[in-house]
UniProtKB/Swiss-Prot annotation:
This is Bradykinin-like peptide AR-10. Induces relaxation of mouse trachea that has been precontracted with methacholine. May induce relaxation of arterial smooth muscle. May target bradykinin receptors (BDKRB). GO terms for biological process: blood vessel diameter maintenance; defense response; vasodilation. It is found in: Secreted. One of its GO terms (cellular component) is extracellular region. Its main location: secreted. One of its GO terms (molecular function) is toxin activity. Keywords: Amphibian defense peptide, G-protein coupled receptor impairing toxin, Secreted, Toxin, Vasoactive, Vasodilator. The lineage of its organism: Eukaryota, Metazoa, Chordata, Craniata, Vertebrata. Belongs to the bradykinin-related peptide family. Expressed by the skin glands. It comes from Ascaphus truei (Coastal tailed frog).
């Protein structure tokens, strides 16, 4: 799951 506050695509 993507972490809130972070961009998993960058």
């Amino acid at each position: 799951a993507p972490v809130p506050g972070l961009s998993p695509f960058r």
